[in-house]
Amino acid sequence: MNNILSEEVLNVTDFTTSRQLTLWKREDLQSPQLDDVAEEVPVALVYNGISHVVMMASPKDLTHFAMGFSLSEGIIDSPREIYGMDVVPSCNGLEVQIDLSSRRFMGLKARRRALAGRTGCGVCGVEQLNDIGKPVQPLPFSQTFNLGNLDRALKHLNDFQPTGKLTGCTHAAAWVMPSGELAGGHEDVGRHVALDKLLGRRATEGEEWRQGAALVSSRASYEMVQKSAMCGVEILFAVSAATTLAVDVAERCNLTLVGFCKPGRATIYTHPQRLIAD
């Protein structure tokens, strides 16, 4: 199989389609013209030949997505438990064919669920309400972050949204180093998928990705908190608000959750002791 870190595509226009549409401005209905629209395709994650989940996603960075999903859903504990991946066309979408260790595959089969997700929806397909939420080990308090450095990260977050700049239709997730510099980031039409891509990337990067925090351009849902905690992320910044369930989950698993992140301000929901106000 191909190396799990291989890039599927390089050109941002591979993720957009030109469609004819009509723009409206007050007192000015313009003639039809071409504009860029973000691609959204079904992506199936296939473990050892068995399809486990279908998510709607942007068709790029899919090996990172598969790695992040596998980690954040507890399918694996380590990237070493995935031996390889291939991204291949399938029907009306794409498949990520994943070579999973035998031990992990047996565990996956024991708790397999059939998911036909909406855009990055992680609850779709869960059979019972009791199945929502996974046990997460409480996080340690090993990280700190100076809020004075957050402005720098916010300023450059959209650098990782080239498709979003063309279409206005993607979410971003980026890794913020303690200095406020962004180590890297990913975009997707689904906010959960964007975060999974980031978590998958982080799992295979070097030491500079161990310190810092995750930053997302969207609101913070309970699942984004849970995914972050499952991957050992202690601090999650969100540009928009957090839900009540997200706050409850963050409190229980010792994750520092911060929303409404804007230059010079933020709302700290849980565990402020990791944050330095400078």
Curated annotation (Swiss-Prot):
Cellular component GO terms, alphabetical: cytoplasm
GO MF annotations, alphabetized: sulfur carrier activity; sulfurtransferase activity
Family: Belongs to the FdhD family.
Entry keyword annotation includes Cytoplasm: yes
Originating organism: Salmonella agona (strain SL483)
InterPro entries: Cytidine_deaminase-like (IPR016193), FdhD (IPR003786)
Taxonomic superkingdom: Bacteria
Protein name: Sulfur carrier protein FdhD
PANTHER family cross-referenced by the UniProt entry: FORMATE DEHYDROGENASE, SULFUR CARRIER PROTEIN FDHD
Active-site residues, as the UniProt record annotates them: 121
Gene: fdhD
